[in-house]
Amino acid sequence: MDASTKVLVNISIPEAAERAASTGADGVGLLRIEHLILSTNKTPEKYIEDHGSKAYVEELIRGISVVADAFYPLPVRVRTLDAPTDEFRQLQGGEEEPQEHNPMLGYRGIRRSLIKFGDKFIKNSSNLTNV
């Protein structure tokens, strides 16, 4: 049984992956993919409307791959889209985002993904192992 302590890094932007990997970390404990989306300045729906779902998936794969390549063969844990509604409202296409008293506790994360995308979300999440 391995009882050693693992040191994992959190990464918000793929461009930080190489520097983070050079620290000798044992992998990525949290890759925040919402920052990949926020950097496009469009909500996922608006990005897909403008560029198509294939381009959206390719954008995510590009960012995740940069991190996965920098840390290979170490583990990379990816968090699904977790931006709060107030951050989405600031993006192109964010006009329809709900106004919430406390966006940090509201419509976000897995709740948002399952409500908006249901079974598609579950099926597509399994593709992360292919990155």
Set out the residue ranges of the language-model regions.
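Conserved alpha/beta-domain cores
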Residues: 1-131
